[in-house]
A protein has these predicted regions:
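Bacterial N-terminal signal peptides that target proteins for export
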Residues: 1-9
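C-terminal motif of bacterial Sec signal peptides marking the signal peptidase cleavage site
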Residues: 18-21
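Predominantly extracytoplasmic/ectodomain segments of secreted and cell-surface proteins
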Residues: 23-171
Length: 171
């Protein structure tokens, strides 16, 4: 009877040890963090122009015209990953208002978030395509990796003509 009890006890301990050894690994979920992140596409969704015109009576007037996709006046953007710059080679018209621009960004698969650096501070703002951005000066836009520990910073410039088309400028 004691041998049977000892045999049953040993069998129970070995079985329990075998079952418990499997529990540790399956309860842990492993995640792979990718450091590669990039902005892969940028386009302007909406931008305003301040159009100057002369009325029939000879007075000057200004009205605002909003350009949206798929306007032919909205340029494409070049993304230079080596120099970390984004810019338009075809300048926007002179009367374009760069202070409130809606843009759309596409990012690589493993990008965790996109943030825009403030104009007067190092504060970062989460990018959304529904918030306008002031591009009167070049802006830094950061694409972070999936766990937000590393980022790639791009210097984004929206170019516009410096003088009105068809005007003569003397220095």
């Amino acid at each position: 009877r004691d041998k049977r009890f000892l045999y049953t006890l040993c069998l129970t301990i070995v079985s329990s040890w075998g079952l418990l050894s499997c529990l540790g690994d399956s309860a842990t979920t492993e995640y792979t963090i990718y450091d590669e992140t990039a902005i892969t596409h940028m386009e302007i969704l909406s931008i305003n122009r301040k159009i100057h015109t002369t009325s029939k009576s000879g007075g000057d007037s200004v009205y605002t015209k909003t350009l949206t996709r798929p306007s032919k006046l909205l340029p494409g953007f070049t993304i230079d990953h080596e120099n970390k710059t984004i810019y338009n080679t075809d300048s926007l018209p002179y009367d374009t208002d760069l202070s409130r621009v809606l843009i759309s960004l596409s990012v690589s698969t493993y990008t965790g978030g996109v943030y825009v650096k403030g104009t007067s501070s190092d504060e970062l703002y989460y990018y959304t395509s529904t918030d306008s951005i002031d591009f009167t000066t070049p802006r830094e836009i950061r694409a972070y990796n999936s766990d937000l520990t590393k980022y790639r910073a791009y210097q984004v410039t929206i170019n516009k003509h410096q003088v009105e088309a068809g005007s003569i400028f003397w220095e």
